[in-house]
């Protein structure tokens, strides 16, 4: 089993991933995907599955064992890719379950968009974890950034809707290429954040 497969297995079978799926499914079922509670919980729940994985490896000392068995690049990419996938699924999977099995009428939601939004916030949380060496900042930092972006876009930067978190999931503006335009933007953000994560972890390993 390579580094990525091991990380993905740890992420998807972690208690925090299961907890996140249950929480989001409850919110979607009792309220709706469009509810304010769902919107607020997205960056928080997305941070749960695997954003602090590198911190745990560092504090336990396992990182040295991992780096003996795998290349540095494979180790770092395995961490961030597993984080992105698990964070995306913890948001999109509950919506899919609700649409398929719990909704009064079967419906289709923008699952790819919700997956990408979750992946983005999970990667942001992972960057914060490495940058601050603090799990609490990782779990709460994405929410703070999301909230600041909401305030900025609603009060001061109304025309800059491409950085408005709610607009990614529930568009009110006319997007170039419509949903595909939002997908491209989110993928671009994710790639940038992943690159930042890679460089931060690489430097941390080098300095250790």
Regions found by a protein language model. Name each.
Residues 1-20:
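Aromatic- and glycine-rich beta-strand/loop motifs that create alpha-glucan
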Residues 6, 60-61, 126:
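Positions in alpha-helical segments
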Residues 20-53, 78-135, 168-185:
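Secretory targeting signals
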């Amino acid at each position: 089993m390579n580094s990525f497969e091991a990380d993905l297995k740890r992420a998807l079978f972690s208690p925090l991933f299961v907890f996140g799926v249950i929480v989001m499914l409850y919110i979607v079922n009792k309220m709706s995907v469009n509810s304010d509670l769902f919107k607020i919980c997205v960056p928080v729940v997305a941070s749960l599955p695997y954003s602090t994985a590198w911190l745990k490896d560092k504090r336990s000392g396992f990182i040295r064992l991992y780096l003996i068995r795998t290349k540095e690049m494979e180790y770092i990419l395995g961490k961030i890719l597993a984080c992105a996938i698990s964070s995306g699924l913890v948001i999109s999977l509950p919506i899919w379950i609700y649409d398929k099995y719990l909704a009064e009428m079967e419906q289709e939601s923008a699952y790819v968009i919700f997956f990408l939004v979750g992946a983005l916030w999970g990667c942001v949380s992972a960057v914060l974890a490495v940058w601050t060496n603090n799990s609490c900042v990782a779990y709460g930092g994405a929410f703070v950034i999301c909230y600041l972006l909401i305030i900025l876009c609603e009060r001061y930067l109304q025309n800059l809707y491409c950085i408005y978190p709610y607009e990614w999931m529930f568009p009110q503006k006319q997007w170039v290429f419509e949903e595909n335009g939002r997908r491209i933007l989110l993928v671009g953000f994710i790639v940038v954040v992943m690159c930042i994560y890679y460089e931060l972890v690489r430097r941390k390993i080098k300095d250790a």
